[in-house]
Amino acid sequence: MLVIPAVDMKNKKCVQLIQGNPDKKHVELDNPPEIAKKWVNEGAEMLHLVDLDGALDGKRVNDEFIEEIIKTSGVPVQIGGGIRSIEDAVYLVEKGAKKVIIGTVAVENPEIIKELSEKIGSEKIMVSLDAKNGKVVIKGWKEKTKYTPVEIGKILEEMGAGSILFTNVDSEGLLNGINIEPTKELVDNLKIPIVASGGVTTIDDLLKFKEIGVYGVVVGSAIYKNLINLKDAIEAVK
């Protein structure tokens, strides 16, 4: 199982938000490419980049940093935030992204995944599903949909999504542990790999995810606040 450090960018800084709230940050650091390098030096085999400005404003803002990290990190990079069109996704793949993460737009219009998979291949498409109280939420967690994660997950898998990034919003950024059940349901019901995110605070949390068969776990706040040592975490889940 992969342990994938998050490098979330806002206003050209590396940040970690509490419950996705742009006004509530518990980490704010300069020079995202340097941070990315630090995680790779500690053993990260993949990086998770998020353009938070893009996610909140609907357009990509941190391309310069993203391109620098792709060029200099030496590991595959998955990228999300502000990817609202096929053109955006193709652009990032051409720049060297291993996977592009599509969120809201895929849930609202699953057909876009079919079209995109024909252009760039399923293996490059990761769909981001965020769930709150058992239902998928979109538009920066502001809007609730009628779908459960498994319902929309099956539709997106059929359309050509290559993997799912699943965030249980109820535990995201709060640093109080994980609820494994919603992720387990996805792993049990879908064929494509599931990458989990949200609420990991201990190596024990990571081992629980490993046990249910996720492909990887994105870690953010816990490594920035030194609750988890990345090297130890990678070693523990090998």
UniProtKB/Swiss-Prot annotation:
EC number assigned by the record: 5.3.1.16
Active site: 8 (proton acceptor), 130 (proton donor)
MF term (GO), any: 1-(5-phosphoribosyl)-5-[(5-phosphoribosylamino)methylideneamino]imidazole-4-carboxamide isomerase activity
Major localisation: cytoplasm
One Gene Ontology term from the biological process aspect of the record: L-tryptophan biosynthetic process
Pathway involvement of the protein, from the record: Amino-acid biosynthesis; L-histidine biosynthesis; L-histidine from 5-phospho-alpha-D-ribose 1-diphosphate: step 4/9
GO cellular component: a single term: cytoplasm
SUPFAM superfamilies referenced in this protein's UniProt entry, alphabetically: Ribulose-phoshate binding barrel (SSF51366)
Subcellular location: Cytoplasm
Catalytic reaction list: 1-(5-phospho-beta-D-ribosyl)-5-[(5-phospho-beta-D-ribosylamino)methylideneamino]imidazole-4-carboxamide = 5-[(5-phospho-1-deoxy-D-ribulos-1-ylimino)methylamino]-1-(5-phospho-beta-D-ribosyl)imidazole-4-carboxamide
TM spans (from-to): none
Pfam families: His_biosynth
Keyword field: Amino-acid biosynthesis, Cytoplasm, Histidine biosynthesis, Isomerase
Classification via InterPro entries: Aldolase_TIM, His_biosynth, HisA_bact_arch, Isoase_HisA-like, Isoase_HisA-like_bact, RibuloseP-bd_barrel
UniProt family annotation: Belongs to the HisA/HisF family.
NCBIfam families in the record: 1-(5-phosphoribosyl)-5-[(5-phosphoribosylamino)methylideneamino]imidazole-4-carboxamide isomerase, PRK13585.1
Stored PANTHER family: 1-(5-PHOSPHORIBOSYL)-5-[(5-PHOSPHORIBOSYLAMINO)METHYLIDENEAMINO] IMIDAZOLE-4-CARBOXAMIDE ISOMERASE (PTHR43090:SF7)
Name of this chain's protein: 1-(5-phosphoribosyl)-5-[(5-phosphoribosylamino)methylideneamino] imidazole-4-carboxamide isomerase
Organism of this sequence: Methanococcus maripaludis (strain C6 / ATCC BAA-1332)
This protein's encoding gene: hisA
